[in-house]
Amino acid sequence: NPPAIFKSYCEIIVTYFPFDEQNCSMKLGTWTYDGTVVAIYPEGPRPDLSNYMQSGEWTLKDYRGFWHSVNYSCCLDTPYLDITYHFILLRLPLYFIVNVIIPC
């Protein structure tokens, strides 16, 4: 089992449905501890997908992780770290055709 399962909301833009692709992001960081106390770094430019479960409706077209260090106006000498992952999801139209169009 993975150490954690994250569920996230992604706004879907349906302009080209069912031949669309979506860009979903997930930002991981901490507001409790700053970058002088905790260090977070991605293991590489792409997330580990060893526990990824494929879907009949979507496929991963691209995915990357980016490390950020931000100094906010409240505390300019204190960095706050995060890793933001971007996932480009490509809809598989066969799922829509088989489950919606054909039954009609």
From Swiss-Prot:
GO terms for molecular function: extracellular ligand-gated monoatomic ion channel activity; transmembrane signaling receptor activity. Disulfide bonds join 10-24, 74-75. Keywords: Cell membrane, Disulfide bond, Glycoprotein, Ion channel, Ion transport, Ligand-gated ion channel, Membrane, Postsynaptic cell membrane, Receptor, Synapse, Transport. It is a multi-pass membrane protein. Coiled coil: none annotated. One of its GO terms (cellular component) is postsynaptic membrane. Residues 1-104 are extracellular. Glycans are attached at residue 23. It is found in: Postsynaptic cell membrane; Cell membrane. It comes from the Eukaryota. Its main location: membrane. It catalyses: K(+)(in) = K(+)(out); Na(+)(in) = Na(+)(out). Upon acetylcholine binding, the AChR responds by an extensive change in conformation that affects all subunits and leads to opening of an ion-conducting channel across the plasma membrane. One of the alpha chains that assemble within the acetylcholine receptor, a pentamer of two alpha chains, a beta, a delta, and a gamma or epsilon chains. Belongs to the ligand-gated ion channel (TC 1.A.9) family. Acetylcholine receptor (TC 1.A.9.1) subfamily. Alpha-1/CHRNA1 sub-subfamily. This is Acetylcholine receptor subunit alpha. It comes from Naja naja (Indian cobra). The lineage of its organism: Eukaryota, Metazoa, Chordata, Craniata, Vertebrata. The gene is CHRNA1.
